């Protein structure tokens, strides 16, 4: 058998100054993906990827840390301004937006793109605590 050589793909530093920050905030986690204007991912992070486990993933602090990590990674590629798309009902929505701004990214627009059903699937039953 032929031996496979260890060829790892090197990260190419792209020079992209404007992009879109997609914040997906669910009841269990917050995922921040920063893309270029065409939708190609440049950097991403999530509360779970940063080591938060269980109920700590759904906190605003975890969302803040995820947004900071994604912002720092995108700024290495030359990102300066972002448009923010927020999706979902989670606790980390506002915290993630504030963290992107605090990290040094200029926010040009904030859009709520939460999908709303026109009476689609039956929702989960109400919790009784």
Curated annotation (Swiss-Prot):
PROSITE patterns in the cross-refs: RIBOSOMAL_S11
Cross-referenced Pfam families: Ribosomal_S11
Domain of life: Bacteria
UniProt-listed InterPro entries: Ribosomal_uS11 (IPR001971), Ribosomal_uS11_bac-type (IPR019981), Ribosomal_uS11_CS (IPR018102), Ribosomal_uS11_sf (IPR036967)
Keyword line: Ribonucleoprotein, Ribosomal protein, RNA-binding, rRNA-binding
Entry annotated with the keyword Ion transport: no
UniProt keyword Membrane, yes or no: no
Cellular component terms (Gene Ontology): ribonucleoprotein complex; ribosome
One GO molecular-function entry: rRNA binding
GO biological process, one term: translation
Transmembrane parts of this sequence: none
Family per record: Belongs to the universal ribosomal protein uS11 family.
HAMAP family associated with the record: Ribosomal_uS11
Function recorded in the entry: Located on the platform of the 30S subunit, it bridges several disparate RNA helices of the 16S rRNA. Forms part of the Shine-Dalgarno cleft in the 70S ribosome.
Subunit structure, interactors included: Part of the 30S ribosomal subunit. Interacts with proteins S7 and S18. Binds to IF-3.
Protein name per UniProt: Small ribosomal subunit protein uS11
